[in-house]
Amino acid sequence: MAASPLVRFAPSPTGFLHIGNARPALLNALFARRAGGRFLLRLDDTDRERSTEEFASAVAEDLGWLGITPDLFFRQSERTALYDTAAERLKAAGRLYPCYETPEELDRRRKRQLGRGLPPIYDRAALALSEADRAALEAEGRRPHWRFKLDHRVVAWNDLVRGESHVDCASLSDPVLVRADGSYLYTLPSVVDDAEVGVTDVIRGEDHVTNTGVQVQLFEALGAAIPAFGHHNLLTTADGEGLSKRLGHLSLRSLREAGYEPAAVRSLAVLTGSAEAVRPVASLDELASLVDLAHLSRAPARFDPAELDGMNARLVHEMPLDAVRERLAALGVPAEAADAFWAAVRANLGRVAEAADWWRVVAGPVTPVVSEPDFIARAARLLPEAPFDAGTWKAWTDAVKAETGAKGRALFMPLRLALTGLDHGPDLSALLPLIGRERAARRLAGETA
């Protein structure tokens, strides 16, 4: 690993980022953080039809929510001149050649190859075209797309995740780098950018392993330094299906809007499918210390929303007041009550936003459920005077128990129903002082208060 690595996350702004995109983004950012390196956000927006400014803005917003602040940023759409220069170099070297087949012609050719038991790779027929042949095709209105001529050899590298790896480029079609309309596909701009800014480590999903064989040859053809490569396992759904931007409920935006903590999403996205126990890690620095690419599993990493729920709850239960003070204020909790309220309710929350429900129980109005009127009337007469404190609930229930003989559930449940309207919730020794004597007395009397 270089002394000061430069890594990159390069999404296409063609949809909202999902939990599967969070994995490479975080692995790269944490890798750089651990090694004192830098993180580049590059928008691969060469797909002019599908790339939108809305999705580009959402990428930055989602990364910020995860706690990732890029050190460098650029868009590929602003760097076309660099790609043009590289393409001309490859043409001059005989490595980029024009092809004129239509998609339909290529499809028929592939079917014939399969029918003869041959691998369906491009047969380089365009290399046999003469100048006159090409002129005739262009006179028909055809415009060439451009393929990179691969050396038919094995490309090997020491993968940061998988160890010794290789791709036999003889088994691959020469990849199209430039479309007939002159726009670039992913491969050439990616290599040019990595070379130009000095990316040292390319950390990405294992679905890019084959691309690495092609890209290594491109780096070589352009006379550029070859970065280290690492290909991590992919997140899948709990059923083992691949994630895509079409799964809106697993988009980072939807998870944020649903009230999940970024630390819970980070922890699950990074630790799932690793040698580390999957657990909530609140600190980015601590999470970075746990990232060891060589200890990632080769098996798919299954993302289970139920596991996210549990992890989020564990984080919320341990959150100090300072971490949620502003959010509690936004939910309507007065500053003077926030400390006692948060201490009372946090162990009952799965998400911070659920605190709003318990503040409504405290401040009202609550319609009491008086299931045993005689018992509640006797309990109301024994209600201590104000002010209430942490010992009020025990003193009161001891007195009610002595007066009525009720104990256990028969003692506590009717009181909980009358005071909160619910059969579950935080410890009433903590909640009762927040409710206060006046509201408690009115609820015990059957009033909505």
Curated annotation (Swiss-Prot):
Record's subunit section: Monomer.
Record's subcellular location: Cytoplasm
Extent of motif 'HIGH' region: 11-21
Functional note: Catalyzes the attachment of glutamate to tRNA(Glu) in a two-step reaction: glutamate is first activated by ATP to form Glu-AMP and then transferred to the acceptor end of tRNA(Glu).
Protein name: Glutamate--tRNA ligase 2
UniProt record similarity statement: Belongs to the class-I aminoacyl-tRNA synthetase family. Glutamate--tRNA ligase type 1 subfamily.
Keyword Protein biosynthesis recorded: yes
HAMAP family in UniProt: Glu_tRNA_synth_type1
Domain of life, source organism: Bacteria
GO annotation, biological process: glutamyl-tRNA aminoacylation
